[in-house]
Regions:
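Flexible metal-binding regulatory segments at protein termini and peripheral loops
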Residues: 1-111, 190, 205-207, 287, ...
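Cytosolic catalytic headpiece
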Residues: 3-5, 32, 190-191, 381-598, ...
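Residue-level signature of catalytic and energy-coupling elements of molecular machines
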Residues: 15, 22, 59, 132, ...
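Conserved cytosolic catalytic loops of P-type ATPases
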Residues: 30-47, 53, 190-283, 382-426, ...
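Actuator/coupling domain of P-type ATPases
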Residues: 57, 61-74, 80, 100, ...
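Bilayer-spanning, highly hydrophobic alpha-helical transmembrane segments
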Residues: 90-97, 305-334, 343-352, 356-364, ...
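Membrane-embedded alpha-helical bundles of multi-pass transporters
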Residues: 101-106, 131-132, 137, 149, ...
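Juxtamembrane helix-loop transition segments at the membrane interface in multi-pass membrane proteins
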Residues: 133-141, 176-189, 362-381, 694-701
């Protein structure tokens, strides 16, 4: 029997080091089989049996609170001066300044100044030293252990003031890091808070306010002007403009009428709407986005995996180097024990890997959160990194570069049948097809009649058309190529077809056993934004744009020239699109952009699969590496620029973290670096790295 898996939300998780220790403590619970801790989302997954009390005991060292995932947690705003850690930091500063005052007035340390410095160390560093000594007893060397050794070492050689300064600066930097990380986490918490927690439900002609968790499918909810929509559903009464920016990133409100779909978390701007609930609270689009974003933030990007491997060996190496500096010069070169012991302590402090360890995850978390708020769902750090390296983008045509709503433009009868009869015959077969062109024929036929001809033995011919039996005769609807496979076309028909295709229209033939009945032309309007977006892609480093389509060469070529695409590949079957993606890899990393439904194999084959219209289809959210929630390409250049910017920030962070350490280590040799300066270098690097990453929260990447 599989062990039970429970998911929890956390409060008070302040640093990556604390997260690692918390996870380690939980693993030591006998009844726990596996633990996954998502630091960016403050989320914990436990496989096995562990109570909330046991989990909170495992996180007691950092005051971590644990809540069931579905429980709504109300964040209490605690004033700065009321937080215990800030109170002890302020007390430590007062005692430190008093100690310096006494020391300065007496021309050096005396019992009173030492007592004040010691009090500053014990009050400001109580939590630090308690944790550090516990870790030291287990030979578990982390940041708190290194700092504790440094403070105790400073006291042992009589540098009480230095020890007190180290404690104070460490406390300040911890507070700044915690504040900055909370800011980064706001990208997720703001998503969670988008949808209302209650809704007005209509039952028996009366209005009741209920929690969204208690709503059922087919319940009818009322949304008044200015209110947020609480659940995904279908409009059954009223019409209004709805601002969908929270889900799709679109700034222009969308007019909703009877039968239209609406999403939880979007804003009803004008009229009153009655909406029939179509999804439970945990299945809404915003709930799925939150879940996928949290999973994405937990996934480690290649750069982060490298940094984690490096840090694993880095800390023990620093400990060994520190010990060697303390011992070798006095033993072999006649150096002073006190001087070299102090230098070893400084190396210990400088060597803390905090800034390095956090340099990548904080940038990834912030960038993915920013993208989600702008209507782009990036499903992992690896996809975020790879997007910035893309050199080739392949586009599906229908619904991606075009509007995806083709309309019948021409009907040509070449038999005794009328044009309406040709259309009706085609529609009677196409009503069983899922192809976008079939829907255009159906819409045209609906204007003529409500009843179609009865057909038998319908069969789809993949990528080419369909056939069925009508009144005892086998009738085909398909491409000119399918017709040519069965019978030659006359030169006059060939010219008619070519003329239509050169206008960017897709041609379908209707024929029976007696011969050709008619020709139907369909046109799908190119999106107004497609041309400008293609040009933007070239300016941000995309070298090649390719359209992959099952449409004919002439139509595809006309659209490709209109949009300025590098290359057009036409008359492709689904498996041929996959082969084409593979062949395009010779030019560099390839992204495939489609609707996430018909293009699933090609999306999976590309280095990065990008699906459009994620807000409207679960399939797009599931199949793609990146989902553009709006049904357009507007956010594609933004996504690529965000990826490139994130990579730059990560490299900057790593350079800052390592650069400051190298500089500090060089200053140790001549004895210019003091303990408090070492703390400033280490903690300053951490704060700079976090603040630098927070720049990714801006929309103008």
């Amino acid at each position: 029997m599989a062990a039970e898996k429970n998911v929890y939300r956390l409060q008070g998780l302040t640093c990556t080091n604390c997260a690692a220790k918390f996870e380690k403590n939980i693993r030591q619970i006998d009844t726990v089989e596996d633990v996954q801790l998502n630091f960016g989302a403050s989320k914990l997954t436990v496989t096995g049996d562990a109570s909330i009390l046991q989990l909170e005991e495992a996180g007691a060292f950092d005051g971590i609170k644990v809540f069931p995932e579905k429980q709504r947690v109300i964040k209490q705003h605690i004033p700065f001066w009321k937080k215990r850690e800030n109170q002890t930091t302020i007390a430590s500063l007062i005692l430190l300044l008093a100690g310096y005052g006494v020391s300065t007035s007496n021309g050096g340390n005396n019992w009173l100044s030492i007592a004040l410095f010691l009090a500053a160390i014990l009050i400001g560093g109580y939590s630090l030293m308690k944790e550090g000594l516990r870790n030291l007893s287990k030979l578990d060397f982390d940041m708190s252990t290194l700092m504790t050794i440094a403070v105790i070492g400073a006291a042992l050689i009589g540098d009480w003031a230095e020890g007190a300064v180290v404690v104070f600066l460490f406390s300040v930097s911890e507070a700044l890091e915690s504040y900055s990380i909370d800011k980064a986490r706001n990208s997720i918490s703001s998503l969670i808070d988008i949808a209302p927690s209650t809704a007005i439900v209509l039952r028996g002609g009366k209005e009741f306010e209920v929690d969204v968790e208690n709503l059922q499918i087919n319940d009818v909810i009322l949304i008044k002007p200015g209110q947020k929509i609480a659940m995904d559903g279908e409009v059954i009464q009223g019409d209004s403009s709805v601002n969908q920016a929270a889900i799709t990133g679109e700034s222009v409100p969308v007019h909703k009428v009877l039968g239209d779909e609406v999403f939880a978390g979007t804003l009803n701007e004008e009229g009153s709407l009655q909406v029939r609930v179509t999804k439970l609270a945990e299945d809404t689009t915003i709930a799925k986005i939150i879940h996928l974003v949290e999973e994405a933030q937990a996934e480690k990007a290649p750069t982060q995996q490298f940094v984690d491997r490096f840090a694993k060996y880095y800390t023990p190496a620093i400990l060994v180097i520190s010990l060697l500096i303390m011992v070798i010069p006095p033993l072999t070169m006649g150096g002073l024990w006190g001087e070299w012991f102090y230098k070893g302590l400084v190396v210990l402090v400088v060597g803390c890997p905090c800034a390095l360890v956090i340099s990548t995850p904080i940038a990834i978390v912030t960038a993915i959160g920013n993208a989600a708020r702008n209507g782009v769902l990036i499903k992992g750090g690896i996809h975020l990194e790879e997007t910035g390296q893309i050199k080739v983008i392949a586009f599906d045509k229908t619904g991606t570069l075009t509007e995806g709503r083709p309309e019948v433009t021409d009907i040509i009868s070449v038999s005794s049948m009328t044009e309406d009869e040709v259309l009706l015959q085609a529609a009677s077969i196409e009503k069983f097809s899922q192809h976008p062109l079939a829907s255009s024929i159906m819409r045209a036929a609906e204007k003529l009649t409500d009843s179609l001809i009865e057909v038998e033995n319908f069969q789809s011919i993949t990528g080419k058309g369909a056939k069925a039996v009508i009144d005892g005769q086998l009738v085909h609807v398909g491409s000119p190529n399918l017709y040519r496979e069965m019978s030659p076309l006359g030169s006059s028909f060939e010219q008619q077809i070519l003329d239509l295709q050169q206008q960017g229209k897709t041609v379908m033939m209707v024929w029976s056993e007696k011969g050709l009945n008619g020709i139907i032309a369909v046109a799908d309007q190119v999106r107004k934004s497609s041309l400008s977006i293609i040009q933007k892609l070239y300016t941000i480093g995309i070298e090649k744009t390719v359209m992959l389509t099952g449409d004919n060469h002439s139509t595809a070529k006309a659209i490709g020239q209109q949009l300025g695409l590098s290359e057009v590949k036409a008359e492709l079957l689904p498996h041929e699109k996959v082969q084409m993606i593979k062949s395009l890899r010779q030019y560099g990393k390839v992204a495939m952009v489609g609707d996430g439904v018909n293009d699933a194999p090609a999306l999976a084959t590309a280095n990065v699969g990008i699906a459009m219209g994620g807000a409207g289809t679960d399939t797009a959210l599931e199949t793609a590496d990146i989902a553009l929630m709006a049904d357009d390409l507007e956010k594609l250049p933004y996504t690529i620029k965000l990826s490139k910017r994130t990579k730059q920030v990560i490299l900057q962070n790593i350079s800052i973290a390592l650069g400051l350490k190298v500089l500090a280590l060089l200053l140790i040799i001549p004895g210019w670096l003091t303990l408090w300066m070492a703390v400033m270098a280490d903690m300053g690097a951490t704060v700079i790295v976090v603040l630098n990453s927070l720049r990714l929260m801006r929309n103008n990447v």
